[in-house]
Design a protein with these regions (language model features):
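Alpha-solenoid repeat junctions
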Residues: 3-7, 33-37, 64-68, 84, ...
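Amphipathic alpha-helical scaffolding segments comprising HEAT/armadillo-like alpha-solenoid repeats
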Residues: 5-17, 27, 38-50, 58, ...
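Alpha-helix N-cap/helix-start positions at coil->helix boundaries
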Residues: 22-24, 54-55, 85-89
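Conserved hydrophobic register position within alpha-solenoid helical repeats
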Residues: 29, 60, 92-95
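Axial heme c-ligation environment in periplasmic c-type cytochrome domains
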Residues: 80-83, 90-99, 154-163, 179-206
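The canonical Cys-X-X-Cys-His
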Residues: 131, 139-150, 160, 193, ...
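Detector for the c-type heme attachment site
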Residues: 136, 145-152, 165, 177, ...
Length: 221
């Protein structure tokens, strides 16, 4: 009896969260729902994919890469086909990432996209706040060991404070994926920046691009 009561309480909480206007709360609830009811989760996914919210659509696509459901594969295949036309660029990396999850080749996929010149997959759709945390605190990437941002960090590599004024998104992405392709004036080979695909997931790369593409004036400690 207690178990049924707890399940009913959880279902009620999920229902409220799924219908909340906060996209992040909705996505979190959808992922919880998928753990117990994949069919209902698929119904929500299909609805979310028709929404204007990029966050909700990204969350739905991410879930497609984890569900053990033939319908999830079908929808994901359709989304992949739409990448050649109407699918917003901000969702392209999410589709690739969801597909890659099924074959466990996510980073190899991003490298392949880069090699093919498909920079657009990680150009837009990132989260600037997550990107800020990655740039400042990711242990393996260690951006601030060499770069300075808003007066914090090293000086052996270009200052990233106003990177958005010097580089467009494609150049920012290239500097992460292929850092030795363009050497900043005055630094030569001293930077010796490692290729970040060794340390970052595709989504993290996209978040960093989004962060660096923003004006730094609103970046507060």
């Amino acid at each position: 009896r207690h178990l049924h009561r707890d399940e009913a309480r959880l279902a009620a909480v999920l229902d409220v969260a799924l219908n909340d206007a906060d996209a992040n709360l909705h996505v979190a609830a959808l992922h919880l729902l998928a753990e117990s009811d994949q069919q209902t989760a698929m119904d929500w996914i299909k609805r979310d994919l028709e929404q204007d919210s990029i966050t909700r659509r990204q969350g739905a696509i991410a879930l497609l890469g984890t569900l053990d459901d033939p319908e999830a594969v079908r929808v994901l295949t359709e989304l992949h086909a739409e990448m050649a036309g109407q699918l917003p660029m901000a969702l392209h990396l999410d589709v690739h990432d969801a597909i890659a999850k099924r074959s466990e080749r996510s980073m190899e996929l991003l490298a392949a996209l880069h090699t093919d010149g498909h920079y657009s997959a990680a150009l837009v759709g990132g989260d600037a706040d997550r990107g800020r945390s990655l740039v400042r605190y990711h242990a393996a990437a260690a951006c601030l060991r060499c770069h300075m941002i808003d007066g914090h960090g090293g000086t052996s590599a270009p200052d990233l404070t106003d990177a958005h004024e010097r580089l467009d998104r494609a150049a920012l992405l290239q500097s992460i994926i292929e850092p030795t392709a363009v050497v900043a004036e005055g630094y030569g080979d001293v930077t010796a920046m490692p290729e970040m695909i060794q340390h970052l997931t595709p989504r993290q790369v996209r978040d960093i691009v989004e962060y660096l593409a923003q004006p730094s004036g609103g970046d507060q400690e």
